[in-house]
């Protein structure tokens, strides 16, 4: 159990180190603390905090820095989110106030904005797609035997894939397949659409056309692409500014992390909390032992919940970053609801 003074000392060490990146000694603390106390008393309190594993000494300095356990204690017991300044609030309002044609554009822009505001790496995920239904497939001829297949879902998402018309088929045949798909699948959830494409639809298409060579696979691919989680990442290279690993394999591993959905699912997929902070070893990835991850959900009503996240150093400014995420997700929720209302009214 920490005394009030020890709590003040720990809080000040975290604040000073996360803002300035320098170890803190007893003299600095004596000048910064809101209570009057001698340097000797502060050293005794620091010794206790060090013994408890909440702060540690750096080899190059007589000052102390927070340990991973110290950051965890600070986040759990002492942290209060810092309110955004006027300039930051205006940046968010301006960025989210732009005209967006698709949901993906909003979520992609959000990742870029969060990265610019924090100088860390930002990740965003649009609301869960499991309840989205098929509004319809569209086909756009591109010339020659090239065609663009477009899937439009009920939540306003548009997914497209270019393909070559399979041998033995022509554009009229492909149009007939498209009509069969729309007649039978519009209004079904994307999971149900995928299931039908795997089971009864091939037989139906074959009954009408006496062949379904390759065409069903194309529809399956675009449905699978639409259904999967799609992460947007801002400031990928920012992560290298805070990595203590300088070998090529570690750097390659960090950058590869952002290109593999399975790894991102492992990093972000289990964060069901409204607001969550994972520090160092809690991320269960050896490459991220020097990093912290803050995640926050944003609510879009009946459209589901999305996710925003900040990946930065364990010495990140937690108070400022949490305050930013808390405000940003409220603004993002409002912007998404506004987008969907416009979509429903159109």
Curated annotation (Swiss-Prot):
Top-level division of the source organism's lineage: Bacteria
* GO biological process entries: negative regulation of DNA-templated transcription
Matching entries from InterPro entries are given as: DeoR_HTH, GAF-like_dom_sf, HrcA, HrcA_C, WH-like_DNA-bd_sf, WH_DNA-bd_sf, WHTH_transcript_rep_HrcA_IDD
Keyword Transcription appears in the UniProt entry? yes
Pfam annotation, one family:
HrcA
Annotated Gene Ontology MF terms?
Answer: DNA binding; DNA-binding transcription factor activity
Repeat recorded as keyword:
no
Which UniProt keywords are listed? Repressor, Stress response, Transcription, Transcription regulation
Recorded family membership: Belongs to the HrcA family.
The record's function comment reads: Negative regulator of class I heat shock genes (grpE-dnaK-dnaJ and groELS operons). Prevents heat-shock induction of these operons.
Query: What is the name of this protein?
Result: Heat-inducible transcription repressor HrcA
What gene is this protein translated from? hrcA
């Amino acid at each position: 159990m920490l005394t009030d003074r020890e709590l003040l000392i720990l809080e000040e060490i975290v604040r000073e180190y996360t803002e300035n990146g320098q170890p803190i000694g007893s003299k600095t603390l004596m000048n910064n603390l809101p209570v009057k106390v001698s340097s000797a008393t502060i050293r005794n309190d620091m010794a206790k905090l060090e013994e408890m594993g909440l702060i540690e000494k750096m080899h190059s300095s007589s000052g102390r820095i927070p340990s991973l356990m110290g950051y965890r204690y600070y986040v759990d017991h002492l942290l209060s989110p810092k309110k955004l300044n006027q300039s930051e609030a205006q940046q968010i309002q301006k960025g989210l106030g732009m005209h967006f044609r698709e949901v993906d554009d909003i979520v992609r822009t959000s990742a870029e904005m969060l990265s610019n505001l924090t100088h860390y790496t930002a990740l965003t995920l649009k609301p869960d797609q499991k309840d989205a239904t098929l509004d319809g497939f569209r086909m756009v001829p591109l010339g020659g035997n090239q065609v663009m297949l477009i899937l439009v879902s009920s939540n306003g998402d548009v997914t497209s894939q270019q393909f070559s018309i399979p041998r033995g088929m022509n554009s009229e045949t492909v149009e007939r397949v498209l009509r069969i798909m729309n007649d039978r699948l519009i209004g079904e959830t994307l999971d149900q659409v995928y299931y039908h494409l795997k089971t009864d639809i091939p037989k139906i298409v074959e009954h009408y056309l006496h062949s379904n060579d390759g065409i069903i696979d194309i529809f399956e691919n675009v449905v699978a692409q639409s259904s999967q989680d799609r992460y947007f990442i801002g400031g990928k290279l920012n992560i290298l500014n805070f990595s203590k690993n300088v070998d090529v394999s570690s750097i390659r591993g960090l950058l590869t992390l952002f290109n593999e959905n399975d790894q991102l699912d492992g990093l972000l997929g289990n964060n069901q909390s409204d607001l969550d902070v994972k520090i160092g070893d809690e991320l269960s990835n050896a490459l991220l032992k020097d990093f912290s991850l803050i995640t926050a959900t944003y609510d879009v009503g009946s459209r589901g919940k999305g996710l925003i996240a900040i990946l930065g150093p364990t010495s990140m400014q937690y108070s400022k970053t949490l305050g930013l995420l808390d405000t940003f997700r409220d603004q993002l929720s409002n912007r998404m609801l506004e987008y969907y209302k416009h979509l429903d009214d159109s």
